[in-house]
UniProtKB/Swiss-Prot annotation:
Catalyzes the formation of L-cystathionine from O-succinyl-L-homoserine (OSHS) and L-cysteine, via a gamma-replacement reaction. In the absence of thiol, catalyzes gamma-elimination to form 2-oxobutanoate, succinate and ammonia. It catalyses: O-succinyl-L-homoserine + L-cysteine = L,L-cystathionine + succinate + H(+). Coiled coil: none annotated. Residues 1-24 are annotated as: Disordered. It is an enzyme of class 2 (transferase). This is Cystathionine gamma-synthase. It comes from Mycobacterium tuberculosis (strain ATCC 25618 / H37Rv). Binds 1 pyridoxal phosphate per subunit. PROSITE patterns: CYS_MET_METAB_PP.
Length: 388
């Protein structure tokens, strides 16, 4: 979807955009929610006479189009494309923006799935990469080569919660003729809008906070660059990694409450981080909302809240990390994040196992918490009993 055709261009508030952008009440029925258009093909008024531009569901579907308009609106972008997963969106972005012989700069604590795709798949096609600590702008600049076409940013990163200065990296990318993509999954558009800070592309696993209920898998790319969007659209259609209409509906349903949920996620996560910071079993707490976090000032400047993700390192090492994961009752031991329920995991053995033995290897004493929107007393009580 390349524009908001719904008459909501004048809406400025993020919560209002999340609720209203992308769809207006149906003129025939008055339905206030977008219908689930469960059709694989669309009738034509004569050869080539498309109704609303729809011909085949892989190419376009009205429910998906409404979601794409909503996603563009909440990121304050001109164009958005929805995908069947965050990794499908990642794959599309890399194929659209890189060619054999090109080079990409990535975080030295990137998401394991992103690292695996670049390291195990794109290197087969002679795409080179350099992991670097994105908080160190001098290191980022030194990593850029004449073949660098893309700087891949996560902020906060998964799972070490590092913070990168989006504006500074975007300026560096402009100076060195490299595009800047920001994976905004951890912050969500409710807390951070990278396009406004100078990024060229924003990526989401909409499975996480945007969907928000652990019941749908999806991804998205948002940009103001029409040429890039055309390439994304070509690959979206050509490769076919698109969400079905029910997936698009569920994602759009979740998006409506995103701003409200992120407020509660952030409040709860801050309380959890402060509690864990004072616990003797914990050696360090990684949460950008803590003043002790090295990226706190940058996060406070470019985010409207610090999010719902907290990572901790256990003083007694790997066994203590695994024990904590095993003993919680409210926090559910599971991969993924961003749902209303609280989750706990051991990244080195779960989501980031693919980084083992690499520069991106995750410490085995690390526990990642996706702090949900439950009552904070129950969350703190659960962690207290699990820590003993």
């Amino acid at each position: 979807m390349s524009e908001d055709r719904t008459g909501h261009q004048g809406i400025s508030g993020p919560a209002t955009r999340a609720i209203h952008a992308g769809y207006r009440p149906d003129p025939a029925t008055g339905a206030v929610n977008v219908p689930i258009y469960a059709s694989s093909t669309f009738a034509q008024d004569g050869v080539g006479g498309l109704r609303g531009g729809f011909e085949y569901a892989r190419t376009g579907n009205p429910t998906r189009a409404a979601l794409e308009a909503s996603l563009a609106a909440v990121e304050e972008g001109a164009f958005a494309r929805a995908f069947s997963s965050g990794m499908a969106a990642t794959d599309c972005a890399l194929r659209a923006m890189l060619r054999p012989g090109d080079h990409v700069v990535i975080p030295d604590d990137a998401y394991g799935g992103t690292f695996r795709l670049i390291d195990k798949v794109f290197t087969r096609w002679d795409v080179q990469y350099t992991p670097v600590r994105l908080a160190d702008l001098d290191a980022v600049g030194a990593a850029i080569t004449p073949r660098t076409r893309l700087i891949w940013v996560e902020t906060p990163t998964n799972p070490l919660l590092s913070i990168a200065d989006i504006t500074a990296i975007a300026e560096l990318g402009t100076d060195r003729s490299a595009k800047v993509l920001v994976d905004n999954t951890f912050a969500s558009p409710a807390l951070q809008q990278p396009l406004r800070l100078g990024a060229d592309v924003v990526l989401h696993s909409t499975t996480k906070y945007i969907g928000g209920h652990s019941d749908v898998v999806g991804g998205a790319l948002v940009t103001n660059d029409e040429e890039l969007d055309e390439e994304f659209a070509f690959l979206q259609n050509g490769a076919g990694a698109v969400p079905g209409p029910f997936d698009a509906y569920l994602t759009m349903r979740g998006l409506k409450t995103l701003v409200l949920r992120m407020q509660r996620h952030s409040e709860n996560a801050c309380a959890v981080a402060e509690f864990l910071a004072d616990h003797p079993s914990v050696s360090s707490v990684l949460y950008p909302g803590l003043p002790s976090h090295p990226g706190h000032e940058i996060a406070a400047r470019q985010m409207r809240g610090f999010g719902g993700m907290v990572s901790v390192r256990m003083r007694a090492g790997r066994r203590a990390a695994q024990d904590l994961c095993a003993k919680t009752r409210v926090f559910i031991l599971a991969e993924s994040l961003g749902g209303v329920e609280s989750l706990i995991e051991h990244p080195s053995a779960m989501t980031h196992a693919s980084t083992a033995g690499s520069q991106l290897e995750v410490p085995d004493d690390l526990v990642r918490l996706s702090v949900g929107i439950e009552d904070i007393a129950d969350l703190l009580g659960d962690l207290e009993q699990a820590l003993g």
